[in-house]
Amino acid sequence: MSTQNALSTILVEKITNDTLVLPTLPAIALKVRKSADDPNINLSAMGDVIGQDPSLSARMIKIANSAYMGRSIKVNSISQAVTRIGLRQIKNISTALAMEQLFVSKNDVVSAYLQKEWANTVNIVANSMAVMQLYIARTKKREMSMDIMTLTALTHNIGVLPILTEAERHSEVFANPTFLEVAIDKLAGRIGASIMREWGFGEEFVNVAKCWKDLSYIPEQVTYIDFVRVGAAVSGAIDGQKDAVLNLAIQRDVIDDVAILHSDEFADLAGAAKQIFA
C-alpha cells in the first residue's frame, strides 16, 4: 500500500469508526460562547470575559475600529469595543478571532503547512467579507450577517486540522506535502462538516465546510457559501474552477461584474478585513 493510500485509509477508517480526534474550540472561544448564551449576560460582564485574553481583546478593539463597524470615532477599551460590536455578534466574532490558536504544530513540515493554511484562510476570509460588503451595499439585502460570514469563511477548510494531526503522529512517513494535499482534497470537506456538528454550529457552517468546493451544490437562495466561493476563487484556492465560480456568482447576483473584484474599493475592503487578523 502506498503511503498516500495508507494515510487516506487510516483517516477513512477513523471517520467511519468515529475515532478521529477532532479539534476543540480554543478555551477563550468556549468561554465567550457560553457567556453569550447566558440570557442574563450584559455588555460589562462580556467585556470581563474577553478581557481574560489579551490577544483576543486587542483584536476585538481592532475590529470595533474597522471599516466593517462603520464608525469614525475610535474605541480604546474592550468595554467600548463590546458595546460597539454588540452581544449578538460577539459570539461569532470572538470565536473567529480565536481560531488562529488551532493552527499550531511541533512538527516542522506540518507547522509550515499550518502557517500557510492560516494565511490562505485569512485571505479568503478578507475577500469573502469584502464581497459581502459590496453585495449588501448594492442590493440593500441584509438577511445575512457579517459575523456569521466571518466565521463560516474561517472554518470553511477546518477539516484539514485532523488530517494534519494524523500526519504529525506519523511524521516520518506522512509529513509529505504531496500526500497531505491528496488526503486534504479527498477528505477535508467530510471531516470539516463533522467538526462543525461536534462544535454545535448551525447547518450553514456544516454546508460551507462540506460543500464549498462542490459546485454541484447550489442553494436556492444566496447564502454564505456563495461569498466563501468567490473569496476562495479570488485567492486562487479553487484550482481550475475560478471561472466557473465567478460565472455562477454573476448568475446568482452575488456580484454584478467581475470587474468589481479588481477595483480599489474591493481592495480597500479586503485589506481592512485582513488587518483585523494581522
Model-derived regions, located:
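Terminal helices and disordered tails flanking the catalytic cores of nucleotide-processing hydrolases
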Residues: 3-14, 253, 259-278
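Short helix/strand-capping connector loops at secondary-structure junctions
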Residues: 243-257
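Alpha-helix C-terminal capping segments
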Residues: 170-171, 277
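Conserved alpha-helical "signature site"
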Residues: 1-155, 162-169, 175-177, 183, ...
